[in-house]
A protein has these predicted regions:
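Secretory-pathway ectodomains
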Residues: 14-165
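Bacterial N-terminal signal peptides
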Residues: 1-10
Length: 165
């Protein structure tokens, strides 16, 4: 049984019997499960030994791959064969070296580029498949510099961590 803090998403409207789970805080696993909880596929993730204790976002992509964050700074796309097919290290890329950054949310655009919410730094960065910056949007000042969840709805809708700061 996969218990703990989880992100649970149906894989698609057509496959509503399958569920993608990101279980953390001691479980440190991604899984595809039947609706009854039977695990069909499982991938162990970094966990606390690499400073990571929570999956706040996970996406099942049209390609059949999974987009998730393996540490607080590394966003990865893996195949169901568990091969890393894309990754972006926010701690080292695009001017972030030496800065405090943590990633809680991200999304893939139809063209294959990716939006990553870089909390601490306080920006939404849009990178291409090679990791080059396409666009940067500031999260604003104060408590808005940290997010937990972001969704693209024609704009960016973000859940702030410390709204009253």
């Amino acid at each position: 049984t996969l218990l703990g803090c989880c992100v649970v998403l149906p894989l698609s409207a057509k496959e509503d019997r399958l569920v993608l789970v990101g279980a953390s805080y001691g479980k440190n696993v991604l899984a595809i499960c039947e609706a009854d909880g039977t695990v069909l596929w499982k991938h162990d993730t970094a966990g606390p030994q690499r400073g990571h204790t929570g999956h706040h976002d996970v996406h099942y992509l049209k390609s059949g791959n999974i987009l998730f964050h393996d540490t607080w700074t590394k966003t990865q796309e893996i195949s169901l064969g568990k091969k890393v097919v894309w990754e972006y290290e926010s701690a080292k890329a695009n001017g972030n070296e030496g800065k405090r950054v943590d990633v809680h949310a991200f999304a893939r655009f139809p063209d294959g580029s990716t939006m990553i919410a870089e909390s601490g730094i306080g920006r939404f960065i849009h990178v291409d498949k090679k990791g080059a910056t396409q666009k940067v949007v500031s999260m604003g000042e104060g408590g808005r510099k940290s997010t937990r969840l972001v969704r693209m709805l024609g704009n960016l809708l973000g859940k702030s961590l410390n709204v009253n700061k």
